[in-house]
Amino acid sequence: MPDSRPDTELSNPQSAKAPLDPHLKALENESIHIFREVAAEFERPVMLYSIGKDSSVLLHLARKAFYPGRVPFPLLHVNTGWKFREMIAFRDETARKYDLDLIEHINPRGAAENITPFTHGSAAFTDIMKTESLRQALDAGQFDAAFGGARRDEEASRAKERIYSFRTPDHRWDPRNQRPELWNIYNGMIRKGESVRAFPLSNWTEVDIWRYIQAEDIPLVPLYYAKKRKFVERDGMMILAEDPRLELLPGEVRQEGMIRFRTLGDFPLTGAIRSQATTLEEVIAELEIATVSERQGRAIDRDQSGSMEKKKREGYF
Protein backbone atom coordinates (compact mmCIF):
# COMPACT_ATOMS: atom_id res chain seq x y z
CA MET A 1 0.00 0.00 0.00
CA PRO A 2 1.52 3.41 -0.93
CA ASP A 3 2.68 5.64 1.94
CA SER A 4 0.20 8.50 2.34
CA ARG A 5 2.62 10.84 4.13
CA PRO A 6 3.84 13.92 2.24
CA ASP A 7 6.67 13.03 -0.14
CA THR A 8 9.05 15.51 1.43
CA GLU A 9 8.68 13.91 4.86
CA LEU A 10 10.16 10.71 3.40
CA SER A 11 13.36 12.46 2.34
CA ASN A 12 16.44 11.64 4.37
CA PRO A 13 17.53 14.68 6.43
CA GLN A 14 20.91 12.96 6.95
CA SER A 15 21.91 13.32 3.30
CA ALA A 16 23.82 16.60 3.20
CA LYS A 17 25.11 18.09 -0.05
CA ALA A 18 28.70 17.55 1.13
CA PRO A 19 30.37 16.25 4.32
CA LEU A 20 30.18 18.72 7.19
CA ASP A 21 33.41 20.26 8.40
CA PRO A 22 34.63 18.79 11.74
CA HIS A 23 33.44 21.75 13.83
CA LEU A 24 29.86 21.65 12.52
CA LYS A 25 29.82 17.85 12.69
CA ALA A 26 30.80 17.97 16.38
CA LEU A 27 28.03 20.49 17.10
CA GLU A 28 25.51 18.40 15.18
CA ASN A 29 26.49 15.23 17.05
CA GLU A 30 26.11 16.98 20.42
CA SER A 31 22.67 18.34 19.50
CA ILE A 32 21.42 14.97 18.26
CA HIS A 33 22.69 13.35 21.46
CA ILE A 34 20.72 15.90 23.54
CA PHE A 35 17.54 15.25 21.56
CA ARG A 36 17.83 11.51 22.10
CA GLU A 37 18.69 11.87 25.80
CA VAL A 38 15.65 14.03 26.49
CA ALA A 39 13.34 11.80 24.46
CA ALA A 40 14.57 8.79 26.44
CA GLU A 41 14.47 10.42 29.90
CA PHE A 42 11.21 12.36 29.88
CA GLU A 43 7.61 11.24 29.45
CA ARG A 44 6.14 14.21 27.57
CA PRO A 45 8.70 16.32 25.70
CA VAL A 46 7.71 19.11 23.34
CA MET A 47 9.70 21.35 21.02
CA LEU A 48 9.17 25.10 21.20
CA TYR A 49 8.93 26.30 17.61
CA SER A 50 9.27 30.02 16.97
CA ILE A 51 9.72 29.71 13.18
CA GLY A 52 13.06 31.53 13.03
CA LYS A 53 16.44 30.30 11.79
CA ASP A 54 17.33 28.61 15.10
CA SER A 55 14.00 26.78 15.17
CA SER A 56 14.58 25.68 11.58
CA VAL A 57 17.98 24.24 12.50
CA LEU A 58 16.49 22.68 15.64
CA LEU A 59 13.78 20.98 13.60
CA HIS A 60 16.30 19.71 11.06
CA LEU A 61 18.38 18.20 13.87
CA ALA A 62 15.29 16.61 15.44
CA ARG A 63 14.42 15.01 12.12
CA LYS A 64 17.98 13.69 11.84
CA ALA A 65 17.96 12.38 15.42
CA PHE A 66 14.92 10.17 14.85
CA TYR A 67 15.09 9.37 11.14
CA PRO A 68 13.57 7.31 9.53
CA GLY A 69 10.76 7.76 12.06
CA ARG A 70 8.69 10.91 12.47
CA VAL A 71 9.66 13.50 15.05
CA PRO A 72 8.30 11.76 18.19
CA PHE A 73 7.03 14.85 20.00
CA PRO A 74 4.80 17.79 19.07
CA LEU A 75 5.97 21.27 18.15
CA LEU A 76 4.51 24.14 20.16
CA HIS A 77 4.13 27.60 18.66
CA VAL A 78 3.14 30.31 21.12
CA ASN A 79 1.43 32.75 18.79
CA THR A 80 0.98 36.34 19.92
CA GLY A 81 -1.06 37.33 16.90
CA TRP A 82 1.65 39.81 15.87
CA LYS A 83 4.09 37.62 13.98
CA PHE A 84 5.23 38.57 10.50
CA ARG A 85 2.79 37.21 7.93
CA GLU A 86 5.67 35.44 6.17
CA MET A 87 6.41 33.54 9.38
CA ILE A 88 2.92 32.07 9.69
CA ALA A 89 2.89 31.03 6.03
CA PHE A 90 6.29 29.36 6.47
CA ARG A 91 5.14 27.62 9.67
CA ASP A 92 2.07 26.12 8.05
CA GLU A 93 3.99 24.94 5.00
CA THR A 94 6.71 23.38 7.18
CA ALA A 95 4.16 21.48 9.29
CA ARG A 96 2.50 20.14 6.16
CA LYS A 97 5.78 19.34 4.42
CA TYR A 98 7.23 17.27 7.27
CA ASP A 99 3.97 15.85 8.65
CA LEU A 100 4.50 17.51 12.03
CA ASP A 101 2.22 17.53 15.05
CA LEU A 102 1.94 21.31 15.50
CA ILE A 103 0.22 22.89 18.51
CA GLU A 104 -0.62 26.59 18.33
CA HIS A 105 -1.47 28.43 21.54
CA ILE A 106 -2.74 32.00 21.93
CA ASN A 107 -3.36 33.36 25.43
CA PRO A 108 -7.19 33.56 25.63
CA ARG A 109 -7.06 36.28 28.29
CA GLY A 110 -4.72 38.40 26.20
CA ALA A 111 -6.84 37.92 23.11
CA ALA A 112 -10.06 38.77 24.98
CA GLU A 113 -8.53 41.92 26.46
CA ASN A 114 -6.97 42.89 23.11
CA ILE A 115 -3.45 43.09 24.52
CA THR A 116 -1.20 44.64 21.86
CA PRO A 117 2.39 45.92 21.80
CA PHE A 118 1.07 49.36 20.87
CA THR A 119 -1.49 49.74 23.67
CA HIS A 120 0.35 47.97 26.50
CA GLY A 121 4.06 48.35 25.68
CA SER A 122 6.62 45.64 25.00
CA ALA A 123 7.15 44.51 28.62
CA ALA A 124 3.47 43.90 29.49
CA PHE A 125 2.72 42.50 26.04
CA THR A 126 5.59 40.00 26.26
CA ASP A 127 4.68 38.97 29.79
CA ILE A 128 1.05 38.25 28.88
CA MET A 129 1.24 37.04 25.29
CA LYS A 130 4.51 35.11 25.50
CA THR A 131 5.52 34.17 29.05
CA GLU A 132 2.03 33.64 30.50
CA SER A 133 0.90 32.02 27.26
CA LEU A 134 3.84 29.60 27.26
CA ARG A 135 3.13 28.58 30.86
CA GLN A 136 -0.52 27.96 29.94
CA ALA A 137 0.44 25.76 26.98
CA LEU A 138 3.00 23.74 28.93
CA ASP A 139 0.50 23.14 31.74
CA ALA A 140 -2.27 22.19 29.32
CA GLY A 141 -0.05 19.64 27.60
CA GLN A 142 1.48 18.41 30.88
CA PHE A 143 4.90 18.60 29.21
CA ASP A 144 7.86 17.77 31.45
CA ALA A 145 10.58 18.83 28.99
CA ALA A 146 10.65 21.54 26.34
CA PHE A 147 13.34 21.87 23.68
CA GLY A 148 14.31 25.45 22.89
CA GLY A 149 16.61 27.04 20.34
CA ALA A 150 18.45 29.47 22.65
CA ARG A 151 22.22 29.84 22.22
CA ARG A 152 24.74 31.03 24.78
CA ASP A 153 26.26 33.61 22.44
CA GLU A 154 22.96 35.49 22.06
CA GLU A 155 22.67 37.30 25.36
CA ALA A 156 24.23 37.45 28.85
CA SER A 157 21.55 35.56 30.80
CA ARG A 158 21.51 32.79 28.19
CA ALA A 159 25.30 32.51 28.45
CA LYS A 160 25.02 31.15 31.99
CA GLU A 161 22.11 28.80 31.36
CA ARG A 162 22.74 25.05 31.37
CA ILE A 163 21.80 22.71 28.53
CA TYR A 164 19.27 21.17 30.95
CA SER A 165 17.65 24.25 32.51
CA PHE A 166 15.51 23.24 35.48
CA ARG A 167 12.19 24.94 36.12
CA THR A 168 9.93 24.99 39.17
CA PRO A 169 6.30 23.83 39.01
CA ASP A 170 5.34 27.39 38.01
CA HIS A 171 8.06 27.33 35.29
CA ARG A 172 10.42 29.75 36.99
CA TRP A 173 14.19 29.66 36.48
CA ASP A 174 16.65 30.19 39.33
CA PRO A 175 20.17 30.57 37.90
CA ARG A 176 21.65 29.82 41.35
CA ASN A 177 19.87 26.49 41.59
CA GLN A 178 21.10 24.60 38.54
CA ARG A 179 22.97 21.31 38.29
CA PRO A 180 26.55 20.79 37.11
CA GLU A 181 26.96 19.26 33.66
CA LEU A 182 30.12 17.19 33.28
CA TRP A 183 31.10 16.31 29.71
CA ASN A 184 27.91 15.07 28.02
CA ILE A 185 26.26 13.66 31.15
CA TYR A 186 22.92 15.26 32.02
CA ASN A 187 20.88 14.68 35.16
CA GLY A 188 17.22 14.75 34.19
CA MET A 189 15.76 13.64 37.52
CA ILE A 190 12.88 15.93 38.48
CA ARG A 191 10.12 15.99 41.07
CA LYS A 192 6.46 15.87 40.09
CA GLY A 193 5.42 19.19 38.62
CA GLU A 194 8.94 20.32 37.78
CA SER A 195 10.19 20.51 34.21
CA VAL A 196 13.29 21.05 32.13
CA ARG A 197 14.03 23.34 29.22
CA ALA A 198 16.63 21.62 27.04
CA PHE A 199 18.81 23.62 24.66
CA PRO A 200 20.51 21.50 21.97
CA LEU A 201 21.96 24.62 20.31
CA SER A 202 23.59 26.02 23.46
CA ASN A 203 27.14 25.80 22.12
CA TRP A 204 26.39 27.06 18.62
CA THR A 205 27.09 30.63 17.48
CA GLU A 206 25.09 32.71 15.03
CA VAL A 207 27.69 32.06 12.31
CA ASP A 208 27.60 28.31 13.08
CA ILE A 209 23.84 28.38 12.54
CA TRP A 210 24.18 30.06 9.16
CA ARG A 211 27.02 27.83 8.00
CA TYR A 212 24.97 24.78 8.96
CA ILE A 213 21.94 26.15 7.10
CA GLN A 214 24.17 26.56 4.06
CA ALA A 215 25.71 23.08 4.35
CA GLU A 216 22.38 21.32 4.93
CA ASP A 217 20.30 23.46 2.56
CA ILE A 218 17.73 24.29 5.26
CA PRO A 219 14.81 26.48 4.12
CA LEU A 220 14.17 29.75 5.97
CA VAL A 221 11.62 32.54 6.20
CA PRO A 222 12.51 34.97 3.36
CA LEU A 223 12.74 37.91 5.80
CA TYR A 224 16.30 36.85 6.64
CA TYR A 225 17.42 37.98 3.19
CA ALA A 226 17.69 41.57 2.02
CA LYS A 227 14.96 42.97 -0.19
CA LYS A 228 13.36 46.34 -0.83
CA ARG A 229 10.80 46.66 1.94
CA LYS A 230 8.74 49.45 3.49
CA PHE A 231 9.61 50.47 7.03
CA VAL A 232 9.35 53.24 9.61
CA GLU A 233 12.02 54.36 12.05
CA ARG A 234 10.76 54.13 15.61
CA ASP A 235 12.60 54.03 18.96
CA GLY A 236 15.91 53.53 17.18
CA MET A 237 14.65 50.56 15.15
CA MET A 238 13.49 50.05 11.58
CA ILE A 239 10.02 48.49 11.89
CA LEU A 240 8.46 46.76 8.91
CA ALA A 241 5.53 48.87 7.68
CA GLU A 242 3.67 46.35 5.53
CA ASP A 243 0.95 45.35 8.01
CA PRO A 244 -2.21 47.51 8.05
CA ARG A 245 -2.31 47.34 11.87
CA LEU A 246 0.81 49.53 12.09
CA GLU A 247 -0.39 53.10 12.56
CA LEU A 248 2.08 55.89 11.91
CA LEU A 249 2.88 58.18 14.83
CA PRO A 250 3.09 61.96 14.38
CA GLY A 251 6.16 62.81 12.33
CA GLU A 252 6.69 59.27 11.04
CA VAL A 253 6.86 58.53 7.32
CA ARG A 254 7.05 55.24 5.49
CA GLN A 255 10.41 54.68 3.87
CA GLU A 256 11.63 52.03 1.47
CA GLY A 257 15.04 50.42 1.33
CA MET A 258 17.08 47.23 1.22
CA ILE A 259 16.64 45.68 4.67
CA ARG A 260 16.65 42.25 6.26
CA PHE A 261 16.23 40.75 9.74
CA ARG A 262 18.87 38.98 11.82
CA THR A 263 16.23 37.81 14.29
CA LEU A 264 12.47 37.34 13.96
CA GLY A 265 9.70 37.86 16.50
CA ASP A 266 6.65 40.11 16.68
CA PHE A 267 6.88 42.61 13.84
CA PRO A 268 6.24 45.78 15.94
CA LEU A 269 9.05 44.78 18.34
CA THR A 270 11.67 43.54 15.87
CA GLY A 271 14.08 45.87 14.11
CA ALA A 272 15.55 45.31 10.67
CA ILE A 273 19.05 46.16 9.51
CA ARG A 274 20.16 47.81 6.30
CA SER A 275 21.73 45.14 4.14
CA GLN A 276 22.54 44.09 0.60
CA ALA A 277 22.83 40.40 1.58
CA THR A 278 20.43 38.50 -0.66
CA THR A 279 22.16 35.10 -0.52
CA LEU A 280 23.43 32.75 2.19
CA GLU A 281 27.03 33.52 1.27
CA GLU A 282 26.44 37.24 1.58
CA VAL A 283 24.65 36.87 4.93
CA ILE A 284 27.55 34.84 6.34
CA ALA A 285 30.12 37.35 5.07
CA GLU A 286 28.11 40.15 6.68
CA LEU A 287 27.91 38.34 10.03
CA GLU A 288 31.63 37.63 10.12
CA ILE A 289 32.30 41.35 10.50
CA ALA A 290 29.29 42.18 12.70
CA THR A 291 30.11 43.84 16.03
CA VAL A 292 26.74 43.67 17.81
CA SER A 293 24.48 40.79 18.84
CA GLU A 294 21.46 39.86 16.75
CA ARG A 295 19.34 40.49 19.87
CA GLN A 296 20.04 44.23 19.53
CA GLY A 297 17.08 44.22 17.16
CA ARG A 298 14.63 43.01 19.82
CA ALA A 299 12.79 45.70 21.78
CA ILE A 300 11.89 43.18 24.49
CA ASP A 301 15.57 42.71 25.38
CA ARG A 302 15.98 46.34 26.38
CA ASP A 303 12.61 47.43 27.73
CA GLN A 304 13.93 47.34 31.31
CA SER A 305 17.17 46.73 33.21
CA GLY A 306 18.21 43.06 33.19
CA SER A 307 15.28 42.50 30.87
CA MET A 308 16.00 39.03 29.48
CA GLU A 309 17.10 37.49 32.78
CA LYS A 310 14.00 38.87 34.51
CA LYS A 311 11.79 37.37 31.79
CA LYS A 312 13.55 34.01 31.97
CA ARG A 313 13.17 33.88 35.75
CA GLU A 314 9.42 34.30 35.23
CA GLY A 315 9.22 31.46 32.72
CA TYR A 316 10.12 33.00 29.36
CA PHE A 317 11.60 30.81 26.61
UniProtKB/Swiss-Prot annotation:
Q: What is this protein called?
A: Sulfate adenylyltransferase subunit 2
Cited InterPro entries: PAPS_reduct_dom, Rossmann-like_a/b/a_fold, SO4_adenylTrfase_ssu, Sulfate_adenylyltrnsfr_sub2
The protein's GO terms of the molecular function aspect are: ATP binding; sulfate adenylyltransferase (ATP) activity
Q: Which reaction does it catalyse?
A: sulfate + ATP + H(+) = adenosine 5'-phosphosulfate + diphosphate
Q: Which residues form the signal peptide?
A: none
Instruction: Identify the Gene3D superfamilies for this entry.
Output: HUPs (3.40.50.620)
List the SUPFAM superfamilies.
Answer: Adenine nucleotide alpha hydrolases-like
Q: Which family does it belong to?
A: Belongs to the PAPS reductase family. CysD subfamily.
Known EC number: 2.7.7.4
- Pfam families in the record, alphabetically? PAPS_reduct
